Amino acid sequence: MSGNTGERSFADIITSIRYWVIHSITIPSLFIAGWLFVSTGLAYDVFGSPRPNEYFTENRQGIPLITGRFDPLEQLDEFSRSF
């Protein structure tokens, strides 16, 4: 026989009016906040990733791929100078 922990059952929670009043506001708000975070470009600034139009510049059209096994630091320096 299982004991009672005093917690409400999941079915009781999701059928309550209070749950839906709270979540009908918070879930769309989180979605809108995430959409604004990405669409305004703030996500690019916060995480430091390049914007889609900044991957390839006029000077650098190739992929920055390290091909040398024994001189990777030289290639990294060369790539960083092109930024």
From Swiss-Prot:
Keyword entries, A-Z: Chloroplast, Electron transport, Heme, Iron, Membrane, Metal-binding, Photosynthesis, Photosystem II, Plastid, Thylakoid, Transmembrane, Transmembrane helix, Transport
InterPro entries: PSII_cyt_b559_asu (IPR006217), PSII_cyt_b559_asu_sf (IPR037025), PSII_cyt_b559_CS (IPR006216), PSII_cyt_b559_N (IPR013081), PSII_cytb559_asu_lum (IPR013082)
Gene Ontology MF annotations: electron transfer activity; heme binding; iron ion binding
Biological role stated in the UniProt entry: This b-type cytochrome is tightly associated with the reaction center of photosystem II (PSII). PSII is a light-driven water:plastoquinone oxidoreductase that uses light energy to abstract electrons from H(2)O, generating O(2) and a proton gradient subsequently used for ATP formation. It consists of a core antenna complex that captures photons, and an electron transfer chain that converts photonic excitation into a charge separation.
Organism annotation: Panax ginseng
Transmembrane segments: 21-35
Entry protein name: Cytochrome b559 subunit alpha
GO BP of this protein: photosynthetic electron transport chain
Binding-site residues, heme: H23
One CC-aspect GO term: photosystem II reaction center
Names of required cofactors: heme b
Cofactor: how bound: With its partner (PsbF) binds heme. PSII binds additional chlorophylls, carotenoids and specific lipids.
Highest taxon, organism lineage: Eukaryota
Keyword Heme: yes
Iron as UniProt keyword: yes
Membrane topology: Single-pass membrane protein
Family named by the database record: Belongs to the PsbE/PsbF family.
Entry's localization field: Plastid, Chloroplast thylakoid membrane
Subunit structure, as described in the record: Heterodimer of an alpha subunit and a beta subunit. PSII is composed of 1 copy each of membrane proteins PsbA, PsbB, PsbC, PsbD, PsbE, PsbF, PsbH, PsbI, PsbJ, PsbK, PsbL, PsbM, PsbT, PsbX, PsbY, PsbZ, Psb30/Ycf12, at least 3 peripheral proteins of the oxygen-evolving complex and a large number of cofactors. It forms dimeric complexes.
